[in-house]
């Protein structure tokens, strides 16, 4: 496989893999794998037992028996506890039901298995300003076309806090909240950082539950991190509990 086929997001995921402590020949599901299945092929070249899955069957041309046609909004076609890791790049934002997807991933992961998700970072400062002005986040400059439903529509964009809640409710524990890449234009929005710092400090203090206050400290630290303020895409690494 030509490494030039990898997107900047897929490259970031691939570079992060050594830090995840996966065994050689670990079984990894890449879902959705996309029409060119570039990440699935790269995983195989790195020695992993990689399976690609997508609603678009064209990936079968490149993956052969290592491809499974699957609707990620439905029950996944694998038995329980079969994968060591699942990688989902730029997929969850296209799904109708995050919870059913995450619970299915939880089901097919082995105990202690790893889930890596990337998704547009609508928590980023640039995206927040776009929403303030237009009512739409950075990835969608105008309303979705209601007359022509498309699998690539961003129907499930979510903030970091929402994704954290969904993951924890689905049986995962977030280990890392990273970014895949940063565009230089994002630094122009640094002027808003002091306001965000002060606003979250005041807002989060209103929580009365001591256990949630502890969790809110984690959430606020993430919200004020370089990755969430400036990253184009989130990369969340979570572990099956």
Say what each PLM segment does:
Residues 1-79, 85-89, 99-102, 156-160, ...:
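Conserved N-terminal segment of class I S-adenosyl-L-methionine
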Residues 90-94:
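Short catalytic micro-motifs in class I SAM-dependent methyltransferases
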Residues 4-6, 96-104, 108, 114-239:
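S-adenosyl-L-methionine-dependent methyltransferase catalytic module, highlighting the catalytic core
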Residues 84, 112-113:
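Conserved phosphate-binding and hydrolysis motifs of nucleotide-dependent enzymes
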């Amino acid at each position: 496989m030509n490494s030039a086929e990898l997107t900047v997001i897929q490259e970031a995921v691939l570079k992060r893999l050594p830090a995840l402590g996966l065994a050689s020949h670990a079984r990894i599901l890449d879902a959705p794998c996309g029409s060119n299945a570039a990440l699935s092929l790269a995983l195989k070249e790195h020695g992993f037992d990689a399976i690609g899955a997508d609603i678009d069957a064209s990936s079968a041309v490149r993956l052969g028996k290592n491809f499974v046609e699957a609707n990620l909004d439905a029950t996944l076609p694998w038995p329980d506890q079969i994968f060591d890791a699942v990688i989902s790049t730029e997929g969850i934002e296209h799904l109708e039901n995050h919870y059913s997807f995450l619970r299915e991933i939880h089901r097919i992961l082995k105990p202690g298995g790893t889930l890596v998700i990337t998704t547009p970072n609508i928590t980023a400062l640039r995206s927040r300003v776009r929403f303030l002005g237009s009512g739409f986040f950075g990835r969608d400059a105008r309303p979705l076309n209601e007359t022509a439903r498309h699998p690539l529509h961003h129907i499930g964009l979510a903030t970091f806090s929402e994704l954290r809640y969904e993951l924890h409710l689905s049986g995962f524990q977030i280990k890392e909240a990273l970014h895949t890449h940063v565009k230089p234009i994002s630094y122009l929005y640094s002027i808003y950082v002091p306001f965000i710092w002060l606003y979250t400090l005041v807002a989060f203090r209103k929580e009365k539950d001591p256990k949630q206050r502890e969790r809110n400290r984690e959430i606020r630290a993430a919200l004020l991190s370089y990755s969430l303020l400036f990253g184009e895409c989130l990369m969340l690494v979570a572990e099956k509990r």
